[in-house]
């Protein structure tokens, strides 16, 4: 069956083309316009959407088919009398064929046998058929339907003879009166006339007001009824178009009309045609032949390739001169971190070269295999109609493991409670480095060393287990030795929550110190319960109650004050109340946590620390969280893999198996993993190697695509407007406690009007910016404000690598103005400080003429004469607004001295220079803010 156009099918169903297009869209079929053709399955779906209209449209063509069942060509002429059944009963509704039609029939002897079996007048008026009364029941409402819009069925065609004075389809004019103009010449079939004997399709399809019109110059109605159609015209109303196999075989002398394209109403002049229709319509899209002859035959069906190209053109978008597949705005594309344009092109089945051009049009330059960041993919997705989702590292690693049939969440969910056994609690000790934390750890270890192990512990691996007797039951506790709290922050930044309880050590004679507050912030941010150990109570200046009062300000309320935090007064030097501290840890674990694990499966856990030993290779301290780790197991730790060759405990003894919460040293890995990387045991070494290689590739791509800055003051207001951020986190470091307090109070008083944005200071402290500050800013997406302090060299590199924004001020009002403008979105162009280099003072030479001369070694960059400089001593800025007044190398004046060379630096009248100071040089460059 030939394909149907949308507007034709809509007319057949009695609906508008717009309604048909909307219905097709709801059915999941995307059609560009009403002139598009649709396949038979789509036609069937649209017909089924309008069951009532489909039946009424099909009845006129199916009713007269019964008397002509014996003839294969009968279905074509059988459609002619059907409009009589739906037309209003009148004398003018059934006129006899006129003389012109009679002459046409007389000159065609081969057509004579056709009308015999096809006379359908009695069959069309049979009242017993249930289908016949439906079209005739509402003649007024049938006007827009195809049956009612067809030309008058009973009117004879005067023929398309160009020499006839009545020639043409005069009856197709909707405004003509029933009387007609008998002798009016019809110039429509003049080959030199522009109309070419054809009325417009709109006029042909318009219903006749006032009923059918008798033919021009015709006599009264013939008693024999209307002349049956003998030609092979176009598709009957409500039915499919005919194909060449349905053409009547006996009609050979007359020229045939265009295949399947004519409306009901016959072919060209002199040939067979249906009565009453406009003559010689060659069909939509075909050229009309001269003298009423049909145009050339229509081309055959489109090939699958042509159909596919047409479909792709309908669903593509042209950007920058190239066409790429477009989405509907809801299509989700999931991309891994560090994905490239080639990955994006593979997802949408497009040419990667076209995407490179599209991205260039959008103002971004990238190659096909270059790793891109999330913002670039979001820009490209918004332009093409796709929602881009960058897979998080956790989900990416989960999908990677699922590719090897490893589902950790499913394993945990399917755990049988009968297999779960209690496990020891994991405890991390934190606090100020001078408050006895290390001595307390040594006291706990020494008081629990196995008998016969004289001399204490032989080596420290950073984690150990001690037995504790509690209520007559032998229990165990696992302690993680983290010097400072750097490793703890790094593990939290990578999402490895291995700590169950945190012990905060505070010296009773010193009180709460800046690093104590910093450790407290880390523990609270990790969401673990805290036990406070008040150390050094044996000193005369100890004030444990003062410590309790100070920590109450930070949310740690002691139990004796009505809170839920346990405070234990201990002395690590004299071993006072060590057992009570261990008991408090156990009570906190029992009250707040339910610690169980399944030891009867492959081991899973996390790496606490790792180092490279010259004799043993990669040495990794791991903490088993679930399962049991055995010697000989194949394991993968982050991007490292290998077979466990040996395991050792905290005492250096060889261990064959490690159960949950047991820390051990592992030998045999291929490389040194990072602290906080998770590990798992695999079935074979090949699987472990493939997992490690894929993790390494993913990390490498993520690093390539990583932006230098996460959130800066310049783009803070844009992030707020997009709903990505509603809180600005700050870390304030200064050279004096009073300055830090004043800066914090001033910042918290900033008013931002109706669009209020929360300002939160997550950490404040005195001293130089440390690595822990950068780690905390990385986790909480914070901005570091430095007031008269500078970071160390390694800290600056870490901040640059992690994308942390650090701002330095020496006037408090400048910091307040910058933060206020950031909150209000009113940042203006600024001057940017560009570092030139730094030099370390090795020796100070005193001169009565030039003052103090700093004999220095250039550590980085270069030192340039007349450049601006500052003097930094122990991480604190001693003097600002200095200038390199004199610069010499081996008693000769120099314009600049580069890295690795020694030089003499004079700072003019400033003489407060000491050995170990650092002279930093810089210049100010104007930087427009965008």
Swiss-Prot record:
Molecular function in Gene Ontology: GTP binding; GTPase activity; translation initiation factor activity
InterPro entries: EF-G-like_DII, IF2_II, IF2_N, P-loop_NTPase, Small_GTP-bd, T_Tr_GTP-bd_dom, TF_IF2_bacterial-like, TIF_IF2
Compositional bias segments (type: Low complexity): 56-111, 121-162
Biased composition (Basic and acidic residues): 308-320
Binding site for GTP: 431-438, 481-485, 535-538
Region (G3), start-end ranges: 481-484
Region (G4): 535-538
UniProt region (G5), positions on chain: 571-573
GO cellular component terms listed in the entry, alphabetical order: cytosol
Segments for region (Disordered): 51-325
Pfam families named in the record: EF-G_D2, GTP_EFTU, IF-2, IF2_N
Principal location listed in the UniProt entry: cytoplasm
Basic residues composition bias: residue spans: 296-307
Region called G2, residue ranges: 456-460
Keywords: Cytoplasm, GTP-binding, Initiation factor, Nucleotide-binding, Protein biosynthesis
Biased composition (Gly residues): 263-295
tr-type G domain sequence ranges: 422-596
Region feature G1, mapped onto this chain: 431-438
Cross-referenced Gene3D superfamilies: 1.10.10.2480, P-loop containing nucleotide triphosphate hydrolases (3.40.50.300), Translation factors (2.40.30.10), Translation initiation factor IF- 2, domain 3 (3.40.50.10050)
Annotated localization: Cytoplasm
Described purpose of this protein according to its UniProt entry: One of the essential components for the initiation of protein synthesis. Protects formylmethionyl-tRNA from spontaneous hydrolysis and promotes its binding to the 30S ribosomal subunits. Also involved in the hydrolysis of GTP during the formation of the 70S ribosomal complex.
UniProt similarity note: Belongs to the TRAFAC class translation factor GTPase superfamily. Classic translation factor GTPase family. IF-2 subfamily.
Protein name: Translation initiation factor IF-2
Organism: Micrococcus luteus (strain ATCC 4698 / DSM 20030 / JCM 1464 / CCM 169 / CCUG 5858 / IAM 1056 / NBRC 3333 / NCIMB 9278 / NCTC 2665 / VKM Ac-2230) (Micrococcus lysodeikticus)
Taxonomic path: Bacteria, Bacillati, Actinomycetota, Actinomycetes, Micrococcales
